[in-house]
């Protein structure tokens, strides 16, 4: 009932009603349009944060009974049934857009596919630097992003040569966060080979850590300071921070809906028989090596026997090890031939005829709600920061407390008053009071009415 009053209803809808309404919305198949509209709204609200875009894949573990594809889940260090998505965040790590992932797709492929979505909110001419991890390493992907008017920023994938010590110089730099940083950096250019010939000129900024480890970073942005290249690349973990926070406080990995659909039976997937054939070849090689070792032992035994008195320097070699080598050689040849005849990929319908995919429409809608709620919380966290000394570490915790505080709602003189009960500590109460004054100053009206909302917090009770 209390939640219903906040929503302007006599009571909040039941969970089954919410699920039904979400299903009705998902049936329109317009989740991607909702995401695109939110991205455009984010771009209009925070244009200064669009110069750098963090892009990463996110996997959600599935523990149900449906036959979903297996994917590698980095945080668990294993492959399991899961679904994937591609997330786009702004320079501060705040989510802008989520795109449904394709089964088996690499981050490099998803980056190329995401170019039209990026252009939809960036506009046709604005450039941005796209930041991603080594999973997106692909010179072809780099070229596609650059051709689309975007810059690339990522870690270089091994192998690579170590730079000499005299290539580095110490740089002291003040970051956008106002903090001073000291780096040991080397800045150079290199050419990456492209499939089909040709090269791609890239810039490499290598950071040397205090213990001498070299971390090469590649970018096509030649106007960015070397220190800024390193600082921006390190900021990629802001997006990981969002995933962790949203899993805990916004149910990021919740199932949300049970609707599923058949996977594409014609989609080419790795052939399990190929792995079996390769294992057979490996066992045959091991068996042949063992047979050769047995033959060598037999020859050594014969040599020893021939050197004994009365053998006149001759001795017969046991024929069984030689026969074993011949048989093992034939087995290896047969295994290699069988492996070569086994295709590496086959249509999905041949190996998993009952394969399913979770329907992504509901998830796109619920992600839109989560992203909006998180970004609203982020805006409030920025507003409260000047009024709360511990805002960097406790700002969001204070807001979560404020969201659950009881209070009073009443209407007088064309105003909707929201009067919260006191927070758990005077310093928190003072910060919330300052935030309430800023929110009231916006003169926001309650949706569907002409009532102006005013926010206040009750005073702390007198301890005496």
What is the meaning of each model-derived region?
Residues 177-186, 265, 272-464:
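A short, flexible helix-boundary coil/loop motif
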Residues 73-122, 213-215:
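Electropositive, glycine- and tryptophan-enriched low-complexity nucleic-acid-binding patches
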Residues 97-100, 143, 148-239, 247, ...:
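An anionic, glycine-rich sequence signature occurring as long contiguous blocks
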Residues 105-163:
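Domain-level cores of phosphate- or acyl-group-handling catalytic modules
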Residues 1, 14, 18, 49-60, ...:
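Short, conserved catalytic/metal-binding motifs centered on acidic residues
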Residues 9-88:
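Active-site-proximal, Lys/Arg-enriched surface segment
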Residues 219, 227-233, 254-263, 354-358:
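Short, solvent-exposed helix-loop connector elements
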């Amino acid at each position: 009932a209390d939640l219903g009053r906040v929503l302007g209803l006599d009571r909040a809808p039941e969970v089954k009603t919410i699920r039904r309404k979400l299903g009705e919305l998902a049936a329109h198949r317009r989740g991607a349009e909702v995401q695109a509209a939110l991205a455009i709204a984010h771009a209009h609200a925070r244009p200064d944060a669009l110069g750098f875009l963090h892009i990463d894949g996110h996997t959600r573990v599935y523990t149900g009974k449906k036959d979903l594809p297996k994917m590698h889940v980095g945080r668990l260090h294993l492959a399991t049934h899961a679904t994937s998505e591609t997330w786009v965040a702004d320079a501060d790590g705040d989510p802008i857009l989520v795109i449904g992932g394709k089964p088996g797709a690499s981050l490099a492929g998803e980056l190329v596919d995401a170019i039209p979505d990026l252009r939809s909110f960036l506009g046709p001419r604005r450039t941005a630097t796209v930041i991603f991890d080594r999973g997106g390493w692909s010179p072809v992907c780099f070229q596609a992003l650059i051709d689309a008017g975007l810059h690339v920023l990522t870690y270089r994938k091994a192998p690579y040569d170590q730079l000499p010590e005299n290539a580095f110089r110490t740089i002291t730099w003040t970051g956008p966060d106002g903090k001073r940083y000291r780096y040991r950096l080397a800045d150079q250019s290199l050419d990456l080979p492209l499939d089909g010939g040709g090269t791609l000129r890239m810039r490499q900024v290598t950071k040397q850590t205090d213990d001498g480890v070299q971390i090469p970073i590649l970018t096509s942005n030649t106007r960015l300071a070397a220190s800024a290249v390193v600082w921006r690349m390190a900021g990629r973990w802001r997006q990981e921070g969002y995933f962790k926070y949203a899993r805990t406080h916004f149910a990021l990995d919740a199932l949300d809906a049970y609707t599923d659909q058949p996977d594409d039976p014609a989609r080419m997937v790795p052939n399990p028989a190929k792995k079996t054939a390769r294992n057979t070849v490996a066992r045959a090689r091991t068996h042949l090596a063992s047979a050769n070792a047995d033959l060598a032992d037999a020859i050594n035994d014969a040599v020893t026997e021939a050197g004994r008195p009365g053998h006149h320097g001759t001795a017969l070699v046991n024929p069984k090890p030689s026969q074993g080598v011949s048989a093992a050689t034939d087995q290896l040849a047969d295994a290699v031939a069988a492996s070569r005849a086994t295709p590496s990929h086959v249509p999905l319908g041949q190996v998993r005829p009952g394969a399913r995919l979770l329907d992504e429409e509901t998830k796109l809608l619920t992600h839109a709600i989560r992203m909006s709620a998180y970004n609203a919380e982020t805006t409030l966290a920025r507003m409260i920061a000047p009024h709360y000394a511990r805002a960097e570490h406790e700002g969001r915790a204070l807001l979560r407390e404020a969201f659950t505080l009881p209070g009073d709602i009443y209407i007088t003189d064309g105003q909707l008053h929201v009067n919260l009960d006191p927070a758990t500590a005077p310093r928190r109460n003072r910060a919330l009071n300052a935030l309430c004054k800023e929110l009231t100053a916006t003169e926001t009206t309650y949706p569907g009415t002409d009532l102006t909302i005013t926010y206040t917090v009750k005073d702390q009770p007198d301890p005496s």
